[in-house]
Amino acid sequence: MKGIYSALLVSFDKDGNINEKGLREIIRHNIDVCKIDGLYVGGSTGENFMLSTDEKKRIFEIAMDEAKGQVKLIAQVGSVNLKEAVELAKFTTDLGYDAISAVTPFYYKFDFNEIKHYYETIINSVDNKLIIYSIPFLTGVNMSIEQFAELFENDKIIGVKFTAADFYLLERMRKAFPDKLIFAGFDEMMLPATVLGVDGAIGSTFNVNGVRARQIFEAAQKGDIETALEVQHVTNDLITDILNNGLYQTIKLILQEQGVDAGYCRQPMKEATEEMIAKAKEINKKYF
């Protein structure tokens, strides 16, 4: 399960419907061009929290059909609706996903006992492995190392997608849980996270920048910090340009420039303007 995973983008048509042909093209691009080790399906990058249960299921089906046996597949099934999370956990386990993942329950200020109940309910409903999806800056849920330890007492909870800039907590967790998987979740911080011993990374920009992500990861693991830092500098220049132009819209526009039918974003995300399209063309030419 270690390595470089793209947080899978989803192609939508102008009316917000899933563009199945485009989604398959994105998956193929990730596998054939970006050379990723796996796909993290149904996360923030997939605009998951704006989708119906049936739409989520269809995306899980397409990803499995297109990528089965070629790369590892992790299904993000988390939801504030626990019944939906359990339903999706069962659905993706039956499809054959290598692991499931679940974002910490958000919006309502759940206490830790409620969060623990949420995870135990999901993982105890299936014969599978679970990776916690920790992204405090969006969920408002900041778990302590003691709370992670309590969750990790369940052997079926095998790791965490750590999308935070708290490198002290990351170091403490790596030391405390040597047998648990830790995936870095911030693409722009991949080098320091790798130095601290993460087992891999899950990133949105890997949909276009997966090759550089692997270069950073492998160079840092070998102790070649100079090379890793050089590639991280280029990567962060790219990320800065993407963020300044609109994250998901720009990644999709870059893919369009590379011949992939990446489609539109789901409303209420805005449609790319002519200025955004022109800038994305410049970004693609500059970095790829």
Curated annotation (Swiss-Prot):
EC number: 4.1.3.3
Residues given in the record as aceneuramate binding sites: 44-45, 163, 185, 187-188, 204
Consequence of substituting residue 133 to F/H/W/C: Large decrease in activity but increase in substrate affinity
UniProt xrefs under SMART domains: DHDPS (SM01130)
Keywords in alphabetical order: Carbohydrate metabolism, Cytoplasm, Lyase, Schiff base
pH dependence (record): Optimum pH is 7.6.
One Pfam family matching this protein: DHDPS
UniProt pathway: Amino-sugar metabolism; N-acetylneuraminate degradation; D-fructose 6-phosphate from N-acetylneuraminate: step 1/5
Gene Ontology biological-process entries: carbohydrate metabolic process; N-acetylneuraminate catabolic process
Catalytic activity: aceneuramate = aldehydo-N-acetyl-D-mannosamine + pyruvate
InterPro entries documented for this protein: Aldolase_TIM, DapA-like, NanA, Schiff_base-form_aldolases_AS, Schiff_base-form_aldolases_CS
Residue pairs linked by disulfide bridges in the UniProt entry: none
Keyword Cytoplasm belongs to the record: yes
Transmembrane segments: none
Phenotype when changing residue 187 to E: 9-fold decrease in substrate affinity but almost no change in activity
Family: Belongs to the DapA family. NanA subfamily.
Biological function: Catalyzes the reversible aldol cleavage of N-acetylneuraminic acid (sialic acid; Neu5Ac) to form pyruvate and N-acetylmannosamine (ManNAc) via a Schiff base intermediate.
The name this protein goes by in its record: N-acetylneuraminate lyase
Organism whose genome encodes this protein: Clostridium perfringens (strain 13 / Type A)
Classification lineage: Bacteria, Bacillati, Bacillota, Clostridia, Eubacteriales
